[in-house]
Amino acid sequence: MKKKIAEYEVGEQVDIFLLIKTATKGIASNGKPFLTVILQDPSGDIEAKLWDVSPEVEKQYVAETIVKVAGDILNYKGRIQLRVKQIRVANENEVTDISDFVEKAPVKKEDMVEKITQYIFEMRNPNIQRLTRHLLNKHQNEFLDYPAATKNHHEFVSGLAYHVVSMLDLAKAISNLYPSLDKDLLYAGVILHDLGKVIELSGPISTTYTLEGNLLGHISIMVNEIGKAADELQIDAEEVLILQHIVLSHHGKAEWGSPKPPLVKEAEILHYIDNLDAKMNMMDRALGRTKPGEYTERVFALDNRSFYKPSFHN
């Protein structure tokens, strides 16, 4: 079986079909234009530069284009890159479907839906349960397909649902340890906190921000969605306000994107759970591409650190 992009090591030659995830234009120090492209297959993605690009070439190499690339893998300032020697757009008879080139969550959608539904059934507060079920049903198709982000963590097909399932399991374990926590609020917060991303983001492949995403952001979007759901369900209770606060504050601080800090116990815990699961995903994926006794490439969202994989970890 042909190697995937994440399986290549520094110094190895590459001759492979990949999907352009993103393509960003820049101007080099010599004044000439270049493209920074993120290329992907189901194993992950890698950055590459296309130098001295003409307007015609720029139009060729856009997001969602499958290309045949030849080059070699290098480590540039702690980041793994693909140095391109040859590149061309793939012919129709060479490749089948874009979906063959995208990374997907390691759990089936049906299994994730079943697990999330079970957590909703465990809720005892009828207002919280009805609001959560209503909003999940409204956005379920997109929720099961979309990534949790454009980069950094869970940025793959069904990544949003996978992130939520992991967080729910964390929330359950923490609630069992600290029984004073309101499980209903915490579970609902986990399910709803990033649900606005189905409106903020463009879709599961070559994900970008929508107009609403750029102008409002997923936090504001979801606060409004909770308010609309409450009106539709004729729920006029404090639970609505608390759920809105939990979503509004889950980034923790204004400089991290939350207009208000957590002022409810469950909001504070949700912030930690979200942060923990995102960071674990980043570390696990970086370490999964690393041999024992070596360091990962730099992880930008974790203070640009390289993590060591102990030699006794196989």
Swiss-Prot record:
Q: Name one GO molecular function term.
A: 3'-5'-RNA exonuclease activity
What does the record give as the DNA-binding region? Answer: 14-90
EC class of this enzyme?
hydrolase
Q: Which PROSITE patterns match?
A: HD
One Pfam family name is: tRNA_anti-codon
- Which InterPro entries would you find in this protein's record? 3'-5'_exoribonuclease_YhaM (IPR020873), HD/PDEase_dom (IPR003607), HD_domain (IPR006674), NA-bd_OB-fold (IPR012340), NA-bd_OB_tRNA (IPR004365), YhaM_exoribonuc/phosphodiest (IPR050798)
EC number(s) from the headed UniProt entry = 3.1.-.-
Keyword Nuclease carried by entry: yes
**Statement: the UniProt record of this protein carries the keyword Iron-sulfur:** no
Q: Which UniProt keywords apply?
A: DNA-binding, Exonuclease, Hydrolase, Nuclease
SUPFAM superfamilies in alphabetical order: HD-domain/PDEase-like, Nucleic acid-binding proteins
Lineage: superkingdom: Bacteria
Residue span, HD domain: 163-279
Biological processes, Gene Ontology terms: rRNA 3'-end processing
Q: Which residue positions does the secretion signal occupy?
A: none
Instruction: Describe the function of this protein.
Output: Shows a 3'-5' exoribonuclease activity.
List, alphabetically, the PANTHER family matched. 3'-5' EXORIBONUCLEASE YHAM (PTHR37294:SF1)
Which family does the entry's similarity section mention?
Belongs to the YhaM family.
Protein name as catalogued: 3'-5' exoribonuclease YhaM
Q: Which organism is it from?
A: Bacillus cereus (strain ATCC 14579 / DSM 31 / CCUG 7414 / JCM 2152 / NBRC 15305 / NCIMB 9373 / NCTC 2599 / NRRL B-3711)
